[in-house]
Amino acid sequence: MATSTLGRVAQALLAPALALGATVGLASAPASAAVWNSCDQWGNTSLNGYTLYNNIWGSGAGSQCVWANSGTNWGVWANHPNTGGIKSYPNAKKVVNKPITSLTSLTSNYNVTVPSSGAYNTSYDIWDTGYKYEVMLWVNKTGAVGPLGTSQGTVTLGGATWTVYKGNNGSNEVFSFIRSSNSGSGTVNILPILKWIKDTKGWFGNVTIGDVQFGYEITSSSGGLNFTTNNLTVSSS
């Protein structure tokens, strides 16, 4: 569930970083040497227009390391215990910073390799600039994980069919779209989803979209699991 999400965003911007699990850094590295890697709790860097975060924000977390060949090709090795509660959301962020009505397009392509075990979701996390509204798009999920809030039915938008949930985590409104079937690659047309929330449901107004994040919301990955973003692009105009 997307609880304490505002906290994880704020914490991901903090420095200095806290070292965590540095001895397992090599386990997270790709076959070829990455241009950047970090096992720090809040480790982050900027690469070709994207900002990468290790972002171990939940309580009871284990070890986690992130590596990157670029902002669009990166991965995570995580060893979090088999306990409840989200441990981390390692992600890549693209800044949009445009009101919805000023956008003519907002799309993303993704291609990931994810484990068959553990408990996690692969998701977009889209924020307004005031961090009052959070839109999550789950493209796949495994294990005992579920969205915050109550079901609002299903809708076909942006190239997929989703079950929609609406809730509040105490800090912000959360609108979660859970894809009807797991997908490891595809294209998401994000703008029609935002317009549906704004125009059809009226859940927010003409907010300014700040961040489009993409990553892995990990609850458990006992023994160490690899999550690889083979390719990610976020484009807006």
Listing of model-derived features with the role each one plays in the protein:
Residues 82-156:
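Extracellular-facing segments of soluble proteins and assemblies that are Gly/Ser/Thr-biased and enriched
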Residues 20-30:
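C-terminal segment of classical bacterial N-terminal signal peptides
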Residues 129-191:
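Short helix-loop boundary/capping segments
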Residues 184-237:
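Long, compositionally biased interface segments
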Residues 34-77, 236-237:
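N-terminal segment immediately downstream of the Sec signal-peptide cleavage site
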